[in-house]
Amino acid sequence: MKLTKTALCTALFATFTFSANAQTYPDLPVGIKGGTGALIGDTVYVGLGSGGDKFYTLDLKDPSAQWKEIATFPGGERNQPVAAAVDGKLYVFGGLQKNEKGELQLVNDAYRYNPSDNTWMKLPTRSPRGLVGSSGASHGDKVYILGGSNLSIFNGFFQDNVAAGEDKGKKDEIVAAYFDQRPEDYFFTTELLSYEPSTNKWRNEGRIPFSGRAGAAFTIQGNDLVVVNGEIKPGLRTAETHQGKFTAKGVQWKNLPDLPAPKGKSQDGLAGALAGYSNGYYLVTGGANFPGSIKQFKEGKLHAHKGLSKAWHNEVYTLNNGKWSIVGELPMNIGYGFSVSYNNKVLLIGGETDGGKALTSVKAISYDGKKLTVE
């Protein structure tokens, strides 16, 4: 699809351009939101979520390439799994799926895909924590996983709902009790986890010095880790951002400034934002929240998003010299897609937009310090 070239001023006088002449990527065969993916060499892998038990690949270096379906994922349909690539293979962990009773449940299994023979293998291991709302990235020979919901609490909520049957009164009581808790009482994962495929071992890489998160944007570039926002309890996000660094003594963390609020709006934090690097600049965009939830929480309302409507966003933020700024906007709101850094661009693959509609689009954004380009 060709876009008309347009320029306008944005915050800090950055130029925002729709590019009509750059490479475009084909749409996904199906809309994929709440899925996962990874980059292996020049090939991107995306699947699961609203894509069912399917995975698709695209050769990014071939301008004429189309998406291709690979072997069916053997772990069944699931939402919000975690994936990363190590040593030319794709690893998929956890997620949320229905059991034989029809209950939505967190699962903690693990699978490996080998591109050389198009085969999946279930691994003889289980994640030590719940992996829904978790975010993963690879570094060296390990997969690092940050955040996630508590398996027992999350599963218990869905089990109780199914057990309540058609009793609306009981269901309302279960929902009220679930959301009327402090953030710390959900026991979101507060350790940085790692999985090393060569030894099939999980490792506790240390406690993070900030609250547990679900749906945070999490990236690793070189020795730097960046964490942006995420839920601190169901329905309530935070605007906090953090940076870590791999050192001989483990990961050392520091706080970054909060994500700024768009002009005329409050900043209620983001979950499901997409992030990556372009020309050395860290970019984060999209995500969803409940505007007004932080205000209600500060007023003492533990069910912070009660009565509020979910909103999806399109602002593009960049981190430069430890400071955040808004450098432009996407042509649509987006969240809960897959993002990957490639060829000095951040590809935004699938996701959802207003009302939760699944997207098939593949957009590319780039930033050179002065101009944001959206393709």
Swiss-Prot record:
Keywords: Carbohydrate metabolism, Isomerase, Kelch repeat, Periplasm, Repeat, Signal
Subcellular location: Periplasm
EC number: 5.1.3.24
Intervals holding Kelch repeats: 43-87, 89-140, 142-176, 177-222, 225-273, 295-344, 346-375
Alphabetical list of Gene3D superfamilies matching this protein: Kelch-type beta propeller (2.120.10.80)
Chief location bin: periplasm
Signal peptide: 1-22
Family annotation (InterPro entries): Kelch-typ_b-propeller, NANM, NanM_proteobact
Catalytic residues identified in the record: 231 (proton acceptor)
GO cellular component: periplasmic space
Similarity section: Belongs to the NanM family.
Oligomeric form and interacting partners: Homodimer.
Protein purpose: Converts alpha-N-acetylneuranimic acid (Neu5Ac) to the beta-anomer, accelerating the equilibrium between the alpha- and beta-anomers. Probably facilitates sialidase-negative bacteria to compete successfully for limited amounts of extracellular Neu5Ac, which is likely taken up in the beta-anomer. In addition, the rapid removal of sialic acid from solution might be advantageous to the bacterium to damp down host responses.
Protein name: N-acetylneuraminate epimerase
Gene name of the record: nanM
